Structure formats: C-alpha cells, structure tokens
Amino acid sequence: MDAQLEWASSLVPKRQLQQQQQQQEQQQQQQQDFHKDQLMTVGMRIRQRVDQGYASRTPSTSDASLQPGVIRDYSSVIVPQFTRSPLPTANSLPPMLINQRTMSTEASSLEKWDVAEPAAEHETMVNGSKRRL
C-alpha cells in the first residue's frame, strides 16, 4: 500500500509539470502566431502610412509637420510646364544604317559561307594553296 501511495504522490508533480509545459508551449505558439500576423501585415501597414502622408508622431517631428493627408507636389517647381512628348508611330521602318562600304543589299547571310563541294570540308586554303586535313 505504501508503494501505491508513493506512486500516486509522484504522479501529481508530473501532471503539474506536464500542464506547465503545455501552458508554456501554448504561450510560445501564441507569440509565434502574433509575430507571423505582424509580418504578414507589414506591407499593408506601410501602404497605410504612405497614404496618410507620414502623419505618425515621432520625437523628431514638429507639430507643424503633422498635418494628416498632406503630400506636397513639387513637380511644377522641378520641371516648370512639363509636357510629355508623343512617341513616334511604329508604322514606318527605322532608317537604314549605311556606311561607305555597306549597303542594305550586302547584308551578311549564311549563303556566303556555304561550302559548294562536300570534299571541300576537309580542305583548307593556306597561303593560296589547298591542303588536306
């Protein structure tokens, strides 16, 4: 009977230890979930701050700069009366690049390099004379 009491009394601390471990694991899981949620919403929070015009209060900002929704447009100051020029239409061909020695009819092609004779594959020209390989 003493062995049974001793065994029963040893179970109580083990159960308490298991419960404490489970509680700690649950707390760690909740913290991990919280951090994952924070990371998943970073992009949304950044866009929200940009939309608000950086109206968050930081120690280095003054009260005058904390007007919500104010985004200053400096485009007219940087480039006064800026207008976008239209792009050329793609209906016409681009101009030919012509040099003194090149013409559009003399474009490089593989026909110049084709070998007329099958036996010529094994011959090469060295100093004007044919040599077999």
UniProtKB/Swiss-Prot annotation:
Main localisation: cytoplasm
GO biological process annotation, one example: protein localization
Ranges annotated as biased composition (Low complexity): 16-32
Region (Disordered): 1-40, 109-133
Gene Ontology CC terms, in alphabetical order: cytoplasm; nucleus
Domain of life according to the entry: Eukaryota
Basic and acidic residues biased stretches: 109-124
Modifications made to the protein after synthesis: Phosphorylated by DUN1 in response to DNA damage which leads to its degradation.
Keyword Nucleus carried by entry: yes
Induction data: During S phase of cell cycle.
Keywords, in A-Z order: Cytoplasm, Nucleus, Phosphoprotein
Any GO molecular function: ribonucleoside-diphosphate reductase inhibitor activity
InterPro entries the UniProt entry points to: RNR_inhibitor
Annotated localization: Cytoplasm; Nucleus
Family to which this protein belongs: Belongs to the DIF1/spd1 family.
Purpose: Mediates the nuclear localization of RNR2 and RNR4, 2 subunits of the ribonucleotide reductase.
PANTHER family listed in its UniProt record: DAMAGE-REGULATED IMPORT FACILITATOR 1, DAMAGE-REGULATED IMPORT FACILITATOR 1-RELATED
Subunit structure: Interacts with RNR2 and RNR4.
Name of the protein in question: Damage-regulated import facilitator 1
Organism: Saccharomyces cerevisiae (strain ATCC 204508 / S288c) (Baker's yeast)
Classification lineage: Eukaryota, Fungi, Dikarya, Ascomycota, Saccharomycotina
